[in-house]
Amino acid sequence: MFLAQEIIRKKRDGEPLSDEEIRFFINGVYDNTVSEGQIAALAMTIFFHDMDLQERVALTLAMRDSGHTLDWRREALGGPVVDKHSTGGVGDVTSLMLGPMIAACGGFVPMVSGRGLGHTGGTLDKLEAIPGLAIFLDDDAFRSQVKQVGVAIMGQTHSLAPADKRIYATRDITATVDSIPLITASILAKKLAEGLDALVMDVKVGSGALMPTLAGSEALAQAIVGVANGAGCRTIALLTDMNQVLASSAGNALEVREAVRFLTNDERNPRLFEVTMALCSEMLMIAGLAHSEDAARTALVRALDSGEAAERFGRMVAVQGGPADFVQRYDLYLPVATLSKPVFPAGEGYIRSMDTRALGMTVVALGGGRQRARDAIDYSVGLTEMARLGDYVDANTPLAVVHAASEESWARAAEAVRAAIQLGDVAPQALPVVYRRITAAAD
């Protein structure tokens, strides 16, 4: 028998916690025998004193086990269960293409996704731009869809890692969100509850990332990879660039439109294509569906060019309650903003840098994200035709097209876009799309 306050004291004094102490505390979080104040106190002691790998694994598994864990063995799927998780960014629509692409290559993707958080877009918010599509499925429906279609994307239910919800709510109001052990456990508790054989992490780097610096992102990636593998799930991470909007668009319906056009080969932003292909290739290799990157890319191109990936996306939408002909007629179903106009720069020159976080907050301010939990979202608003780093822009070349609900909203967004994009006389050096591949925790 343990006492929550003694566990807090032990960590406060810099001592490691045992697996049993961690599990006792997390069980108390779940059954409400641990108070919000005690959660806050332990979170702050972890923030200052960190956790070793064994503690991080124990915390993650305890949070996972606070709820239901999916077990795919009885489904006889005939292929590996694999998923991807991104630490979040702006215009990061990869999940909508990646899931169907992996399904078309023989994998099974049970993706539990989230809503937008701060400046970052949320996969669930994007999917809700599709009329009729259900984002909360019961276990039986989720299992059935993964088995039949190969991919399902839904929101976190009350049965999946419920302790995480209570801990995160406390972290959010106690300045402990950016603790690597707590971030790691929060991400992986939900992912491991999916019953995965393998996981690929997309850890963003740059002005629109959770961890803006390469060193911070690398530390987070190493922590996640170390804990996930320690918990029995084969995991690697890619560090990918978020110093500019990843897709050509940012905003819910606008990104869904771009995802469909990507899958049907109508339009593919080169950087979005490269990140998606890199993540998918890693998923196929770690899941045993491809023996090399070349083989993986060949299979993925075939899935796209044959139309199989687009067909899987269409089936996913239809099974989850969306229109059966959505892929063919998406422009008839997606909401359209009242006003769409280009934004031109105040001067001219090469785009030297972007405050990608500010561009994400511009979409939120337009109504495309939530500033309070109860806020409604305008799925139609956002940015399209985003200029890229290194582009030369002038009075005839727009920085972006702003989709807004009113002239006033458009004007505010236009000023925010101009302020977020810095021009110079010389084109900047091109940034890599993928910085690094992380396969093990730091020594």
UniProtKB/Swiss-Prot annotation:
Catalytic activity: thymidine + phosphate = 2-deoxy-alpha-D-ribose 1-phosphate + thymine
Subunit field text: Homodimer.
GO molecular function annotation: 1,4-alpha-oligoglucan phosphorylase activity; thymidine phosphorylase activity
HAMAP family: Thymid_phosp
Keywords: Glycosyltransferase, Transferase
SUPFAM superfamilies per UniProt: Nucleoside phosphorylase/phosphoribosyltransferase catalytic domain, Nucleoside phosphorylase/phosphoribosyltransferase N-terminal domain, Pyrimidine nucleoside phosphorylase C-terminal domain
Enzyme class: transferase
Name listed for the protein in its UniProt record: Thymidine phosphorylase
Residue ranges of coiled coil: none
Cross-referenced InterPro entries: Glycosyl_Trfase_fam3 (IPR000312), Glycosyl_Trfase_fam3_N_dom (IPR017459), Glycosyl_Trfase_fam3_N_dom_sf (IPR036320), Nuc_phospho_transferase (IPR035902), PYNP-like_C_sf (IPR036566), PYNP_C (IPR013102), Pyrmidine_PPas_bac/euk (IPR018090), Pyrmidine_PPase_CS (IPR017872)
A GO-annotated cellular component: cytosol
Domain of life: Bacteria
EC number of this enzyme: 2.4.2.4
Family of the protein in this entry: Belongs to the thymidine/pyrimidine-nucleoside phosphorylase family.
Entry's Gene Ontology BP terms: pyrimidine nucleobase metabolic process; thymidine metabolic process
Protein's pathway: Pyrimidine metabolism; dTMP biosynthesis via salvage pathway; dTMP from thymine: step 1/2
Purpose of the protein: The enzymes which catalyze the reversible phosphorolysis of pyrimidine nucleosides are involved in the degradation of these compounds and in their utilization as carbon and energy sources, or in the rescue of pyrimidine bases for nucleotide synthesis.
